[in-house]
Amino acid sequence: MRKQKILIVLFVGSLVLPGVVWAGFSGRFDTENNENRKLAEFPEVNLESLGDFPEQFEAYYKDHVPFKNDLVKFCNFIDTEFFRNTKIGDVVIGEDNWLFYLPEREGENAMADYQKTNVYTLEQSAEIASGIAKVRDWFLDRGVKQFHYYVAPNKETLYSKYMPEKPKVIGIGDSRMETFAKYMKENSDVEFDFLADYLREFTEKYQLFRKYDTHMNNLGGYITNEKIVQDMTGESLPIEDIQVMIGTKPCRGDLSRMIGRYKELNDDREYGLNYFHDGIRYKVKKEESEGGEEILKVFKSNSENEKTLMVIGDSFRLR
């Protein structure tokens, strides 16, 4: 009987004690959102939504359970250091701790892209090409002088040498985007560029992506930008003609945050660029949605070039 009471006390204590400790000392622990999504909020309590409350509260509790980040960090450490796992959630850990983002879900399956298991059929390529052409025509009909469609390569495309042995590339031949780029070149009059081959020429001399992030660094952004400028104006300032400096502060990233090693992985550096386009100054006006998400940036400069450039894209456009 006494043994049962002790077990009951230990069980109840294991449920209650973490919450009590957390309530008093949560400020001393890591409580940042380390996931690439918005965490669930505490659900509203009312008669209309009472039936949904248990499920919504469970989602909230899972996202805000006490010591979550520290527990995740510990589990990830065990996975990588003892069991030598190279994939934690959507993040693949490569050579020299290079991190890659390879989710496997509908609409965002970078893993299938890397493994070359999702190559477009001719019918799919034709449908997508037709959609791009319609967008191009819509802009041209409204006075736009030039329309160009660029596709930036994924990090694992340029830096596959740092990928681990698993996951293995399954498909033979071109990837989905390589196949589609060839289709566009042979069957469409849209100005289209998949930038993998262009950027690959620079990877031996320069690091173009942040080691622990999904995005390009300043070097990758500059080289890509000058490619666009060259296409649009016929002029550019090659990166070889400017001063490149290595920063001194750690360049951390979203991927190291996602696996709970944001502070530990600190050997990467951002690059500074000097002596380019001297005398050019610009101002930036930002517009945000009601939720605080940035939806528009307007740049104005003192450049003699009076042309207007509009860039529509994902987070890579900010580099």
Which residues does each PLM region occupy?
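Extracellular glycan-modifying ectodomains
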Residues: 1-319
